[in-house]
Every structure is written in structure tokens, then in C-alpha cells.
Amino acid sequence: MVKIRLRRIGRKKLPIYQIVAADARARRDGRFLEVLGRYEPTRKPHQLTFNRERLMYWLSVGAQPTDTAKALIRRTGMLYENYMRIKGKSEEEIGTEMETWQQRNDSRLKRGLDRKAIRRKRKKEAEAKEKESAG
């Protein structure tokens, strides 16, 4: 069985992962069939690049992504696009669905960032109040 998974490269304390198609029996950093992309979690924001055509090919022939690889691929909408192709939708329908998915995803990410900013602001205010009352 072929798995789409992460292969760790990089140096100590600075991981970089290659997204690879590998036999399920191979070791984590062992033999693989093809490099499909790269994930750099230490960069801010995290950097994710991959070859869309080859990833779609491996998904179409039955390669199973691991949980972590699936989560990374899901962020880009590739799994949703593959699902629509399997269901037999036309390229036009897929294009419009992907546009609406992208808008929903962008708004979801923006809400998350706004929520973080509000939490930071409240924390600073609470610390300032605490300092005032203690001082």
C-alpha cells in the first residue's frame, strides 16, 4: 500500500519535511517513491509547497495520506477537489465550488486571527489592571 506522508529532513531543532509517496512498510526517513512537496513548520507563517498534478495522481491511484499529511493537504482544498472529481462533477462546477471554498476558508482564517488579537488585547489589559492594583 502506498502512503502519502512526511519525511523529516533538515538539521537538529530545525525540521523541514518532504511530502512523499512511500510504501507503507518503509521507514519514516527511508525509501520513497516520489517527492511530492515540502512543509516548513519553523517559518512564520508555515510554508507548504507541493506539485498538485503529482499529488492528484497519487490520490487517484489509491495512495492513502497519513493523518498529518491529510491535514496539510486539506488546508489547500485538494482533498475537496479530488472528492468532487470522484463524484463526476465537471471542471466548471469544480472551479466555482473551489472559489466559494477559498472564500470560506479565507474568512475562517481571518476570524481566527481576529480572535487571537482580541485575546492578546484582553490579556494586556488584565496585566495592566493587575499592575495598577498591585502598584
Curated annotation (Swiss-Prot):
Residue spans of biased composition, Basic and acidic residues class: 105-116, 124-135
UniProt keyword terms in alphabetical order: Ribonucleoprotein, Ribosomal protein
Pfam families: Ribosomal_S16
This protein's record includes keyword Ribosomal protein: yes
Gene3D superfamilies given in the database record: 3.30.1320.10
InterPro entries linked to this entry: Ribosomal_bS16, Ribosomal_bS16_dom_sf
GO biological process terms, semicolon-separated: translation
One MF annotation (Gene Ontology) recorded for this entry: structural constituent of ribosome
Disulfide bond entries: none
Region (Disordered): 94-135
GO cellular component assignments: cytoplasm; small ribosomal subunit
UniProt family annotation: Belongs to the bacterial ribosomal protein bS16 family.
Record's protein name: Small ribosomal subunit protein bS16
